[in-house]
């Protein structure tokens, strides 16, 4: 069963409009789809419905404020004596006044068709109009149709068409007949800002592109640098050894050096200290041992001895 809502000020007027649209929808083309002026009203003229007089299908029969039940033929649409079933009307519709819609609201995604008969267009443009149209939009099912019937001389037709689009309706169109304007729109079958499926393509973990770095090894706790030292200790030891050799002075035991001092025999300097060449003296790792305690390491074997020239060892008497 098709869900239809008709909003107007009287149930008689709602019945007449619903009967008109239902009679048209029984043809090959429905107003609920593409609305055209010629097809819609030619269908009404040839429908054979005595209760619908196309010559008087103007503002007096469609307008809310100027509705005259005696001249519009609405008595023939009384639910008790109209014989709607004999006219082929099989679908029921919900009826509400506009005040009831604004006070109680509408259920979301319920109706396939919402027909609003309105004589006061102030409720359908501007900020108030957008709120009202959004209410009707949300109550439509996907691909549901919205039809707004307003007076032909309404000065805000263009504004109302825009408000229908702003509310989310698409395929907005309008057609006129005598003193009535029909503005229609369709709710799309998609939702703005709807949930989008995430991509099914997943990137490979970055660990698959980057090789793992080897574990860091340190030989700081070992007596000497490792053969494959990676902590820098081997480089430091090689550098210190090079500096020590550069600062050392080669000497010949058979020659004299250090201002004529004979290095092959014991001799005394002016302070009475014996100067003896020690060819087996420990090798300095820093190269600063001969400069004195101020330049020596804490573990220096020459700690406490006076400064001396490179290649000599001081022996106290």
From Swiss-Prot:
The keyword Cell cycle does not apply. [2Fe-2S] cluster binds at residues 219, 226, 229, 231. A motif (Cx2C motif 1) lies at residues 286-289. Signal peptide: none annotated. It comes from the Eukaryota. Its cofactor is [2Fe-2S] cluster; [4Fe-4S] cluster. One of its GO terms (biological process) is iron-sulfur cluster assembly. Keywords: 2Fe-2S, 4Fe-4S, Cytoplasm, Iron, Iron-sulfur, Metal-binding, Mitochondrion. [4Fe-4S] cluster binds at residues 286, 289, 297, 300. Residues 219-231 are annotated as: Fe-S binding site A. A motif (Cx2C motif 2) lies at residues 297-300. Residues 1-192 are annotated as: N-terminal SAM-like domain. One of its GO terms (cellular component) is mitochondrial intermembrane space. The C-terminal domain binds 2 Fe-S clusters but is otherwise mostly in an intrinsically disordered conformation. Monomer. Belongs to the anamorsin family. This is Anamorsin homolog. It comes from Theileria parva.
